Swiss-Prot record:
Belongs to the NtaA/SnaA/DszA monooxygenase family. RutA subfamily. The lineage of its organism: Bacteria, Pseudomonadati, Pseudomonadota, Gammaproteobacteria, Enterobacterales. The keyword Flavoprotein applies. One of its GO terms (biological process) is nitrogen utilization. It catalyses: uracil + FMNH2 + NADH + O2 = (Z)-3-ureidoacrylate + FMN + NAD(+) + H2O + H(+); thymine + FMNH2 + NADH + O2 = (Z)-2-methylureidoacrylate + FMN + NAD(+) + H2O + H(+). This is Pyrimidine monooxygenase RutA. Its EC number is 1.14.99.46. HAMAP family: RutA. GO terms for molecular function: alkanesulfonate monooxygenase activity; uracil oxygenase activity. FMN binds at residues 26-27, 92, 101, 117-118, 167. The keyword Oxidoreductase applies. InterPro entries: Luciferase-like_dom, Luciferase-like_sf, Pyrimidine_monooxygenase_RutA, SsuD_RutA_monooxygenase.
Length: 339
């Protein structure tokens, strides 16, 4: 069950192990099943406000479910957490894809939203940027109308915005408006398989005249040997919650307008559905370190978002056994030696 104390322990460990950032997702209704898959979630902004107060270096990102929160409120909450964190805060914007999350509270705008959600998000981020950059907005659009709307104090640092688009529309939005774009890794122990997605993002950003890199998501399942790590992975697959995964598949098919290459379609692929196909690195500490170096070498990759089969032990294992073997993290050793 998620608690603040658990999340605090995880993020403080991540800071101690020199992780660069921590991001919390938002889920307003899970997938059910015997495991109650994602049925229990803390609210992202209030969680990250608390974590900002008990950390000192790590960057903190909260996720805004934009159908549930007016942009002016998000702008003010973000400015508040920026103050708490000393300028370490950023916002992940999600349009929303799982209809029951929003329908349960009367906020689903209709299934035509699937085809116009990035128009909605474009107006949303325009209001955010107005308020963060100038402290006021008079934006008038199809979805939002601001009348001398104000936010003060403004953030002390430029507010970073991230998004997670893999559809053409999602990438076009990120190219125009985001600072980074998240994408899923692909497959099991195929660290460079996401390269075409990163290349599409790079091309979209170049077309927009901006530099927007990809942050790729992988799950790490590591142990002292390849065999021990593989045994864990096989154990997890054997216990897959088929009822919850069936619900996910059903919901992923509701959007018929975004094309085949989307995060949600990848999540529902049966290949590695037990961990929603986020891309998985399974192996010894040395094997995982080597594969993460391969990830970092993919053109367009700006960073990696890691999740673990067990966060508390996984973060320590990463910091103590995997990260020291990674060539792409050599700069951390140099920093430690200088200090």
């Amino acid at each position: 069950m998620p608690t603040f104390e658990l999340n605090k322990a995880i993020v403080q460990k991540a800071e101690q192990q020199q992780f660069d950032f921590a991001l919390s997702m938002i889920k307003l209704r899970g997938f059910g099943g015997k495991t109650e898959f994602w049925d229990h979630n803390l609210e992202s902004f209030t969680l990250m406000a608390g974590l900002a107060a008990v950390t000192s270096r790590i960057q903190i990102y909260a996720t805004a479910a934009t159908l549930t929160l007016p942009p002016a409120i998000v702008a003010r909450m973000a400015s508040t957490i920026d103050s708490i964190s000393g300028g370490r805060f950023g916002v992940n914007l999600v349009t929303g894809w799982q209809k029951p999350e929003y329908e349960q509270m009367g906020l689903w705008p209709g299934d035509d939203y699937f085809s116009r959600r990035y128009d909605y998000l474009t107006e949303y981020v325009h209001v955010l940027r107005d308020l963060w950059d100038t402290g006021r907005s008079d934006f008038k659009g199809d979805y939002f109308t601001m009348n001398d709307c104000r936010v003060s104090p403004r953030p002390q640092q430029p507010m970073k915005v991230i998004c997670a688009g893999q559809s053409d529309a999602g990438m076009a939005f990120s190219a125009q408006h985001a600072d980074y774009n998240f994408c899923f890794g692909k497959g099991v122990n195929t660290p460079a398989a996401f390269a075409p997605t990163a290349a599409r993002m790079k091309a979209a950003a170049e077309k927009a005249g901006r530099d927007v890199g990809s942050y790729v998501l992988f799950m790490v399942i590591a142990d002292e040997t390849d065999e021990a790590a593989r045994a864990k992975w096989e154990h997890y697959k054997a216990g897959a919650d088929e009822e919850a995964l069936s619900w996910l598949t059903e919901q992923s098919q509701k959007d018929t307008r975004s094309g085949a290459d989307t995060n949600v379609r990848q999540m529902a692929d049966p290949t590695s559905a037990v961990n929603i196909n986020m891309g998985t690195l399974v192996g010894s500490y040395a094997s995982v370190a080597r594969m993460l170096d391969e990830v970092a070498a993919v053109p367009g990759t700006e960073g990696v978002l890691l999740t673990f089969d067990d966060f508390l032990t996984g973060i320590d294992a990463f910091g103590e056994h995997i990260q020291p073997l990674m060539r792409c993290r050599d700069h951390l050793r140099v920093t430690q030696e200088v200090a």
